[in-house]
């Protein structure tokens, strides 16, 4: 079965190549001396311990349709003489971008490359410990006790580091974090016995329905891990919380930061914002009702039928439902966006109005400042839809 894979030669641009699992390295490039797959070297002609050559197939190198393949040939300079000193330019750029993005958005001092390396080390450590789960371990009280004590200490102090390779064990532990060591030892023995039982079924009766179920779960986890690593390496921006869309505007001379939400049917103003802008007396309380949405049900205190909103140098008349909620000052919903022919231009990061007025979306630091200072919210309450602060 053929599939397409992304291939870059000597730090050149990626090209899509139609290949099959039996496609050889010689078919791709007969002068290949070093090949990276994603973030690891999988082909090194100088490695005498392995029989590398043009006849090696992509299947032998573990190349799949989501793999990124970097090929280096005899024409690529290697001043150090060590082929393994060659690192793909794309990987270096991704690491630099991820490091900068991590520092800006998450305030982390370490680079994403170091983070990915730590993730791989944790994964390898956890898988190494998991590979120790055997009948021999269960039959050796001293060895089992030493391992269970080590696991108990790590789960008490750094469960997140075990969550990648041993998620089920971490989940069981966190369900009862205050358990004693004796209780943990019993739970850990039960967990190890289950894992050993699965491996024994797969080994002794691979064609059984139970074995096939275990194998499928194992393959799915491997695929998830591969996709996660691929995403961390080639799409690090996906790991950064997206900044929600806010704009600056003015109501009655009072500056307001408005949240742009094209998924909201109506536009909403908080009672605090209405009072701050001197609009409290214009609330028509005959329009009291209940609003139902993803966040639950909230009471609408009334409606402001016509509110003059100034964006840049233009004025727009907007209706607003008024709520007592304080988590959001002002929400511009679809009714106002459609009324004024607005376009959310993510390419230029601006909100464009039908009359030609445009205004930029705010940066994350401006939004944080708004939530803390204007809304007077504690920092721990500043949570966006994805749960990030």
From Swiss-Prot:
InterPro entries in alphabetical order: Peptidase_aspartic_DDI1-type, Peptidase_aspartic_dom_sf
Compartments it resides in: Cytoplasm; Nucleus
One GO cellular component term noted in the UniProt record for this chain: cytoplasm
Family per similarity comment: Belongs to the DDI1 family.
PANTHER family reported in the protein's UniProt record: ASPARTYL PROTEASE DDI-RELATED, AT13091P
Domain of life: Eukaryota
Mutant lacking the gene: phenotype: Increased sensitivity to low doses of bortezomib which causes proteasome dysfunction. Double knockout with proteasomal subunit pbs-5 or with rpt-5 knockdown results in failed expression of the proteasomal subunit rpt-3. Double knockout with pbs-5 also results in the occasional mis-localization of the transcription factor skn-1a within gut nuclei.
Gene Ontology annotations of biological process type: negative regulation of synapse assembly; proteolysis
Its EC number(s): 3.4.23.-
Region (Disordered): 109-132
Protein's name according to its UniProt entry: Protein DDI1 homolog 1
Main location: cytoplasm
CDD domains attached to this UniProt entry: RP_DDI (cd05479)
Keywords attached to this entry: Aspartyl protease, Cytoplasm, Hydrolase, Nucleus, Protease
């Amino acid at each position: 079965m053929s599939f397409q894979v992304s291939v870059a030669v000597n730090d050149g641009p990626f090209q899509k190549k139609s290949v099959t699992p039996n496609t050889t390295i010689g078919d791709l490039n007969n002068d290949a001396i070093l090949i990276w797959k994603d973030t690891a070297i999988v082909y090194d002609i100088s490695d005498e311990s392995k029989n590398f050559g043009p006849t090696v197939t992509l299947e032998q190198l573990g190349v799949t349709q989501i793999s990124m393949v970097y090929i280096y040939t005899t024409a690529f300079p290697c001043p150090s003489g060590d082929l393994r000193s060659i690192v793909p330019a794309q990987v270096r750029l991704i690491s630099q971008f991820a490091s900068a993005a991590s520092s800006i958005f998450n305030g982390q001092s370490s680079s994403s490359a170091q983070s990915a390396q730590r993730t791989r080390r944790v994964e390898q450590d956890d898988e190494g410990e998991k590979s120790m789960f055997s009948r021999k371990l269960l039959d050796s009280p001293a060895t089992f006790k030493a391992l269970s004590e080590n696991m108990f200490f790590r789960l008490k102090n750094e469960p997140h580091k075990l969550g990648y390779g041993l998620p089920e064990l971490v989940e069981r532990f966190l369900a009862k974090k205050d358990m004693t060591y004796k209780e943990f030892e019993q739970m850990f023995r039960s967990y190890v016995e289950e894992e050993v039982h699965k491996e024994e079924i797969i080994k002794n009766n691979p064609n059984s329905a139970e074995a096939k179920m275990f194998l499928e779960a194992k393959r799915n986890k491997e695929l998830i891990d591969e996709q996660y690593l691929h995403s961390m390496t080639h799409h690090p921006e996906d790991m950064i919380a997206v900044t929600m869309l806010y704009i600056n505007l003015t109501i009655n001379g009072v500056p307001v930061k408005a949240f742009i939400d094209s998924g909201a049917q109506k536009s909403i103003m908080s009672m605090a914002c209405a009072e701050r802008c001197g609009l409290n007396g214009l609330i028509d309380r005959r329009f009291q009702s209940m609003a139902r949405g993803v966040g639950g049900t909230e009471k609408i205190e009334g409606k402001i039928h016509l509110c003059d909103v100034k964006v840049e140098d233009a004025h727009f008349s907007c209706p607003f439902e008024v709520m007592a909620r304080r988590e959001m000052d002002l929400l511009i919903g679809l009714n106002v966006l459609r009324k004024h022919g607005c376009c959310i231009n993510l390419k230029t990061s601006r909100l464009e109005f039908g009359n030609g007025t445009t205004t930029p979306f705010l940066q994350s630091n401006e939004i944080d400042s708004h939530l803390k200072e204007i809304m007077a919210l504690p920092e721990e309450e500043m949570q966006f839809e994805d749960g990030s602060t």
